[in-house]
Structures are given as C-alpha cells and as structure tokens.
C-alpha cells in the first residue's frame, strides 16, 4: 500500500467517524440491544493483555478497540475495527447460530463470495445503496449461508443469509455478524493491487481494502435520537482530522463519487 493510499484512507476514516449519516437504516438482525445494553449487542473478543485473559465486549465496536498497548500511564489500542460485531440471539442444540441477516436498506446485491475460505470475512455479501449522494455499500460477513445472488434487488429487511462463524480466527462460541457501511474507493483497485500484491485478489473491486468503513455505530445511535440526518451536511460541519495534499493532476475517484467530502 502506497503512502498516498494510506493517507487518503486515514483521512477518509477520520472524516467519516462522525455521529450522523443521513439515511434511515434498519439493524441487520433481531438483536436490538445496541441502544439499551450494548454488552448484549456486541460480540466479545478474546484478549490476553499483561497476563490477564479477558473477553471484553467493547472489542466488537467500531474504531480503535483491539490490540491494547501500554504507553506510559495509559493504554492505547493499535488495531482498527471497521465494522460492528453483532451477537446471535438464537442457537440450535449444538450451539450453531440461527439468526437471519437482513439488508439494512433498499438496494442491489453487488457481490456474494463464491466460497467462505478466500477472505478473513469468510462468506460475505455486499449490497449497493443509492441515496443520491454517491453509492454506499453495506457488507455482511462471517455468514453460514447466503440466500441472495449478485444483481438481485432487495428491500430493507430482505433476508440475505444466516449468521455464522466463517472466516479466520472465529469459532462457534464467537459466532457473529460483522456488518459495515462503506464508501467505494476506486474502480482501478484491481490494477493497483496486482502491481504490488503477493497474494491473489479473489474479490475484485469488492475486496475489503477497497471499501472504506463509516462509523455505523455512531450512525445508529444518532438515528435513534434524531431520524432527520443528512450525511453531506454532517461531514461539512465536522472539523477535519487530517489535511492531505494531492498533486493537482491526480485523479481522485472518491471525490468524484462523493464530492461532499470536500
């Protein structure tokens, strides 16, 4: 990954970590505990830090919530989590989750993985949503089953698949839905990846590296309080965390697709 790409990705993440997004989205499963008891909503992570083994639910949230490091008198988290890990509510006698996963909004299925073993996401689905401010992409990962196909139109609440534990580093006890809401970085991603990658790209432009995660957690909390929210206005009203200098001749597709980021 080039320094330019890293800087752009960091800037976009910072710009998007704001408490309002402007679209009335549904929660993707029957788990509604986010608003009253988040410890029952987020799936825990296993943590071994300074000799203590814990299972904090906070590690399932969006943002820098993983890989704690002690820096002097404080603890900082080095790993960014780009989505929300949602606990299942239903399991069969063997403990296998049964929860239905549904589209958060109307859209078109953009991508469904062919197999579960070619990504850390496991089996995942991407749905494109067009709300008049550039295309947004919701992503649903670690699914046991997918019930839709690419190109299929879906409505808010349409069943997409079944919650599972596919993907690396996840076992039955930590089964969960990883859900994201993303911006699309570049249609030239495949060429960029091929020029420097040492492993194959099995997912084309819907590789997770080409999707920039928004703060979906903050959106749901803000929407719960005030459904009348506007993403472009919220971004313009937010203080910039980074300023990135880009050569004038550079072609930045993300700004063409989402001019309200400026």
Per-region residue spans from a language model:
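Bacterial N-terminal signal peptides that target proteins for export
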Residues: 1-10
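Bacterial N-terminal signal peptides
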Residues: 9-17
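Sec/Tat signal peptide C-region and signal peptidase I cleavage site
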Residues: 18-22
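Surface-exposed, glycine-biased beta-strand/turn segments
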Residues: 23-123, 202-262
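Small beta-barrel nucleic-acid-binding modules, principally OB-folds
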Residues: 80-93, 134, 141, 181, ...
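Zn2+-dependent peptidoglycan hydrolase active-site motif and core
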Residues: 96-98, 102-145, 172-178
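Surface-exposed strand-loop junctions at beta-sheet edges and helix termini
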Residues: 104, 148-149, 154
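Conserved, short, structured surface segments that act as functional micro-motifs
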Residues: 118-128, 142, 152-227
């Amino acid at each position: 990954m080039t320094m330019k790409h890293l800087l752009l990705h960091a800037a976009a993440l910072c710009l998007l970590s704001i408490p309002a997004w402007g679209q009335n989205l549904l929660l993707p499963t029957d788990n509604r505990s986010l608003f009253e008891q988040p410890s029952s909503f987020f799936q825990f992570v296993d943590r071994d830090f300074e000799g203590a083994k814990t299972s904090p639910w906070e590690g399932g949230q969006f943002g820098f919530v993983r890989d704690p490091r002690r820096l002097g008198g404080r603890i900082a988290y080095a790993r960014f989590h780009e989505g929300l890990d949602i606990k299942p509510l239903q399991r069969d006698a063997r403990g296998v989750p049964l929860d239905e996963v549904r589209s958060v909004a109307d859209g078109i299925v953009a991508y469904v993985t062919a197999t579960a073993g070619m990504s850390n996401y496991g089996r995942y689905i991407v749905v494109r949503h067009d709300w008049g401010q550039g295309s947004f992409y919701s992503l649903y990962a670690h699914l046991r089953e997918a019930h839709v196909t690419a190109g299929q139109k879906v409505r808010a609440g349409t069943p997409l698949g079944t919650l599972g534990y596919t993907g690396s580093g996840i076992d039955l006890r930590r089964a969960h839905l990883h859900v994201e809401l993303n911006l699309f970085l570049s249609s030239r991603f495949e060429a960029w990846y091929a020029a420097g990658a040492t492993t194959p790209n099995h997912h084309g432009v819907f590789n997770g590296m080409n999707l920039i995660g928004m703060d979906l957690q903050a959106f749901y909390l803000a929407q719960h309080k005030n459904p009348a929210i506007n993403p472009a206005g919220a971004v313009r009203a937010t203080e910039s965390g980074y300023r990135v200098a880009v050569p004038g001749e550079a072609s930045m597709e993300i700004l063409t697709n989402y001019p309200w980021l400026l």
